[in-house]
Amino acid sequence: TGENSRPHISVVMNFTKPTENKPALLTFNEVETFLHEFGHSLHGMFANSTYKSLSGTNVYWDFVELPSQIMENFAIEKDFLNTFARHYQTGEVLPDELIQRLVDASNFNVAYACLRQISFGLLDMAWYTRNVPFEGDVKVYEQEAWKKAQILPVVKETCMSTQFSHIFAGGYSAGYYSYKLSLIHISE
């Protein structure tokens, strides 16, 4: 009937479990992943649209990853970390030197990581812009698809396509590029 209805949203994740001697302590990767997924949930919660098919993560691929990737940036922000990241026994906040090491680590190998993501986008587009059904060697097809982004030799007997769940089972078919495009939007 065209009425505005608010979404029901949950973030469901698997985190490190507590041990007998320690509570559940999140890894940096878990914090970053939580922030990413929380960005998707905020996108849905703040959406204000009459039609759910045009709302939240149902937007154009060019924008779908923007809120989640923005949220990831908070993982290395001192002011944000100081609101919750404390030693589980002493309550001390993270030392500035450790936060700087997190920042430095996030910048390490960033060019290679960028090319790797571009290669995944190229592979995604190669699979979803075919005009005829595929018949052939998947590994050979894959290597041809992403050769423009390869700077290191391909590791023998690897095949990304067989485990690329984002594009074959995760709803990102012909849309994986959105991860890199959102980073361009963020940097503007």
Predicted regions and their residues:
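Cation-handling catalytic/transport regions enriched in His/Asp/Glu
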Residues: T1-S187
